C-alpha cells in the first residue's frame, strides 16, 4: 500500500487567546484571500463572528467566515454541534443578501445535532442555578456535547435513516424528559413533534453532507490552503479555561485536528488573536477587570470607556461585555497551550486618547508573585494583577495600514507586548473593515 499523499497546501489555525470576542472573524475573512477553504472545528451557534465589509455588518454564528469570499469552500467539521434550525436561518439571511452558501458549504456526516430538548435543558438549568449561573447562551450547546460524550448523541448522518433516528430519539427523549420534569420543573417535550421537526431538515441538509475529513485531505494534497477557524477563546476551553466558567468544547488549536479530522502535522501556523485590552461575557474570574455593567463595584471610568468605544456587546446575546486591561500573563498561558506562531492584535484604535495604559504582566497569588495565569477559577479569582504603565497617544490609529504610521508610544506598547508574550506580532487590526489592517508577517507566506 502506498503512503498517504504529503500535504502540499499550507494551513493556518486562527484561535482566540482570551475569553472570546477577540475579532477572529475579521482576521479569518482577511486571510481567506490566500485560502481556498475555511473550516469550523468546534462550538455551535453560541459564537458570533462579526464582519464589516464595505461598511456592511454581517454576523456569522455557524457558517465559517470564509463564506463572504467568493469561491472559498466552507466546512463544518465533526467537532461542531449543529442546530439545523439555526443553520438554515443563517443560510437564508446570507442568500437573501446575495451570498451563495448551499453550493459552497460542506457538513461532516459525523457532526452531532442540537435537538429541542438540549435547548430546553440548557435554559432550565441556568434558571435553576440562579445567582450561581455559568452564563451560557441558552442555545443547547453544553447539553448536546454532554450527549456526545455519553454516546447517546444523534448525528447528522442519522437523519437519513428515519426508523433508526426515531428509535434513538425515543430513548433520548425518555431520559431527557425525566430530567426536565422531575428535576428542572419544565414541561415534557412531545416525541412526534420533535421527530417531525428534525426529519424535516433532512432533505435540505442532504446535498451539503459529506466526509469532510476526506475532502480536506484531498484539498491539501491538491495544493489548496486551508484555514481552521476557532470559536470562543482559549480561556473558555473546557480543559484549559477558567473551569467551570467555560464553554463545552476544546477551543484550542490542537482541537482543529480532532474536530475537523486532519492530522496534527497539517496544522502549519497558529495565529493567536488578542484584543489590545481584555473582555469577558458572563460569569467567571477576570484579574484585570475594570468594568462590569452588572457589578456596582466594577465601574472604573476607563473600563466604561473601553466598553463604549469598543462597542463591547455580545454579537449573539447582546449582553454587555466586561472590560479590563490587556493581561499578558493570561496571554502567555494561551500561547503555550496553543503553540502560537504569531499574534494578531485587534482593536488597537480603541486605546486612542488614553493618557496612560496598563499591561498586566503577572499576579500576586497568596503572597507569591507569578507570571502566568494559574489553573482553576478559584486561584484565578485570588490573583491580584501586577501592572506596567505606558504613556498613551493622542493621535488616531484608526484605519492605519503601515507600522511606521503608528505613534511611537503605540509602537513601544506593542513591542513590550511582544517581549512579555515571547512571540512576534504578525498583524494589527486598526478598524473593523478587512482593509484596516497592518501586516508585519504573513501567516501563509512567512
Swiss-Prot record:
What residues sit in the active site? 21 (proton acceptor), 49 (proton donor)
Q: Name one GO molecular function term.
A: magnesium ion binding
One GO cellular component, as annotated: cytoplasm
Q: Which cofactor does it need?
A: Mg(2+)
Residues where substrate binds:
315-321
Q: Which residues cross the membrane?
A: none
Q: What class of enzyme is it?
A: ligase
User: Which residues does the record give as GTP binding sites?
Assistant: 20-26, 48-50, 321, 347-349, 429-431
Gene3D superfamilies documented for this protein: Adenylosuccinate Synthetase, subunit A, domain 1, Adenylosuccinate Synthetase, subunit A, domain 2, Adenylosuccinate Synthetase, subunit A, domain 3
Location(s), subcellular: Cytoplasm
Cofactor binding summary note: Binds 1 Mg(2+) ion per subunit.
- List positions binding IMP: 21-24, 46-49, 137, 151, 232, 247, 319
Q: What is its main location?
A: cytoplasm
The cross-references to HAMAP family, in alphabetical order and at most eight, read: Adenylosucc_synth
- Which purpose does this protein serve, as stated in its record? Plays an important role in the de novo pathway of purine nucleotide biosynthesis. Catalyzes the first committed step in the biosynthesis of AMP from IMP.
**Similarity annotation:** Belongs to the adenylosuccinate synthetase family.
Recorded hits in PANTHER family, A to Z, give: ADENYLOSUCCINATE SYNTHETASE
Describe, as the record does, how this protein assembles with itself and its partners: Homodimer.
- Protein's recorded name: Adenylosuccinate synthetase
The primary gene name is purA
Amino acid at each position: 500500500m502506498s503512503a498517504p499523499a504529503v500535504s502540499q497546501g499550507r494551513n493556518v489555525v486562527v484561535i482566540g487567546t482570551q475569553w472570546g470576542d477577540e475579532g477572529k472573524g475579521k482576521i479569518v475573512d482577511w486571510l481567506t484571500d490566500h485560502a481556498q477553504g475555511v473550516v469550523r472545528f468546534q462550538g455551535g451557534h453560541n459564537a458570533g463572528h462579526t464582519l464589516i465589509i464595505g461598511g456592511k455588518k454581517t454576523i456569522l454564528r455557524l457558517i465559517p467566515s470564509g463564506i463572504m469570499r467568493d469561491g472559498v469552500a466552507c466546512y463544518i467539521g465533526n467537532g461542531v454541534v449543529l442546530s439545523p434550525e439555526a443553520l438554515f436561518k443563517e443560510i437564508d439571511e446570507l442568500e437573501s443578501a446575495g451570498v451563495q452558501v448551499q453550493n459552497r458549504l460542506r457538513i461532516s456526516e459525523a457532526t452531532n445535532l442540537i435537538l429541542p430538548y438540549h435547548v430546553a435543558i440548557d435554559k432550565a438549568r441556568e434558571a435553576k442555578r440562579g445567582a450561581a449561573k455559568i452564563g451560557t447562551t441558552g442555545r443547547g450547546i453544553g447539553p448536546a456535547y454532554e450527549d456526545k460524550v455519553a454516546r447517546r448523541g444523534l448525528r447528522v448522518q442519522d437523519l437519513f435513516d428515519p426508523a433508526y433516528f426515531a428509535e434513538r430519539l425515543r430513548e433520548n427523549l425518555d431520559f431527557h424528559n425525566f430530567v426536565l420534569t422531575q428535576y428542572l420543573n419544565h414541561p415534557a417535550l412531545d416525541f412526534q413533534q420533535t421527530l417531525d421537526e428534525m426529519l424535516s431538515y433532512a432533505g435540505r441538509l442532504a446535498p451539503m453532507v459529506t466526509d469532510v475529513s476526506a475532502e480536506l485531505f484531498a484539498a491539501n494534497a491538491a495544493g489548496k490552503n486551508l484555514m481552521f477557524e476557532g470559536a470562543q477563546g482559549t480561556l473558555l476551553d473546557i480543559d484549559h479555561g477558567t473551569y467551570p466558567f467555560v464553554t463545552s468544547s476544546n477551543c484550542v488549536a490542537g482541537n482543529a485536528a480532532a474536530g475537523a479530522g486532519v492530522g496534527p502535522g497539517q496544522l502549519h501556523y497558529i495565529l493567536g488573536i488578542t484584543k489590545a485590552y481584555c473582555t469577558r461575557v458572563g460569569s467567571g474570574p477576570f484579574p484585570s477587570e475594570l468594568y462590569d455593567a452588572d457589578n456596582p463595584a466594577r465601574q472604573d471610568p476607563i473600563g466604561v470607556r473601553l466598553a463604549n468605544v469598543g462597542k463591547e456587546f455580545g454579537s449573539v446575546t447582546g449582553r454587555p461585555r466586561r472590560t479590563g486591561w490587556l493581561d499578558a500573563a493570561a496571554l502567555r498561558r494561551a500561547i503555550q497551550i496553543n503553540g502560537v506562531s504569531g499574534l494578531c492584535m485587534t482593536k488597537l484604535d480603541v486605546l486612542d486618547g488614553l493618557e496612560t495604559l496598563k499591561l498586566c504582566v503577572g499576579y500576586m497569588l497568596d503572597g507569591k508573585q507569578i507570571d502566568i495565569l494559574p489553573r482553576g477559577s478559584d486561584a484565578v479569582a485570588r490573583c491580584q494583577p501586577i501592572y506596567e504603565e505606558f504613556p498613551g497617544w493622542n493621535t488616531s490609529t484608526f484605519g492605519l495600514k503601515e507600522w511606521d504610521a503608528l505613534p511611537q508610544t503605540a509602537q513601544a506598547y506593542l513591542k513590550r507586548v511582544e517581549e512579555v508574550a515571547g512571540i512576534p506580532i504578525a498583524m494589527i487590526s486598526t478598524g473593523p473593515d478587512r482593509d484596516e489592517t497592518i501586516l508585519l508577517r504573513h501567516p501563509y507566506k512567512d
